[in-house]
Amino acid sequence: MKIFKMLAVAVAMFCAVACGEKEGPSNTPTVGSFDAIENEWKLVSVDGVANDFSVYISFTDGLFFLYQQVYSWDYVLYEGEYTIEGGVLNGTYFDGGEWKTAYTGGVSEDGKYLTLKSKEATPVTYIYEACTIPEDIVNEVSRTRATEVVPFL
């Protein structure tokens, strides 16, 4: 009987530790502003859940370069311009299409994470981590129009 009690305590302790709050990118980082958005970013979670597709985005000098492997086997590149007005991020593709929504959020104070919260009826929170976009993705990407394949943004 004593063994069963010890086993029950061990299982309870394991469950308490295993169910504790996770650290890392799935939790929403402290959000600053978009002042430090000019960087390269990799999507790590959507509404706190790790994604099973690949999206990279680079922001530089008012331009964005979106590399995604979402609806295809290959990475697809979308390019365009972005603006930040009143703490809201918007983008337009070079072929004239607009992002599906605008975003609020910002870069974490330590510069490691970018949080984008969609301005939709049911907002979605996207967490990106600062990174360097792999050269093989940049060099082998297919360029496309925003109307040919559904872009992530």
Language-model regions: role of each:
Residues 10-13:
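Short, linear, compositionally biased motifs with a strong N-terminal bias
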